[in-house]
Amino acid sequence: MTWLYQDTPIETLPEECVGFVYLITNNLSGRKYIGKKLAKFSKTTYKTVKQKNGTKKRKKIRSKIDSDWREYYGSSPELTADVITLGTENFTREILYYCKSKSECSYIEAREQFTRKVLESRDYYNGHIQVRVHGSHIIDKI
């Protein structure tokens, strides 16, 4: 099952997209899950460089690699068990928001979870809400 954004199947994410907030729906029971996913992960590798004076120095090389967002079905153990048991064809994955920063992703995910009252109902797989975002990362950026 592919991701949908505004009812359109998505194969690639926009260039400026750092991550996205999503909704996964169990089509059989109606239960839902709100989460966030980063588009790329940072990968650090080390390279040994020989300097002019003959000494060796380790150089950090940082790069971005694609995350597993295409195959991702959330971090909830209960949701993951249902996906394995019922099959991916019984779930709908929707992208609600594209985010331009990690902070924006965290904030919008928590805002959606509080707005939908995910902890107050068994209609959601979400078991906890965890967020820590500084206001300066959000004000005037959303």
Residue ranges and their predicted role:
Residues 1-142:
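Structure-specific nucleic-acid interaction/processing domains
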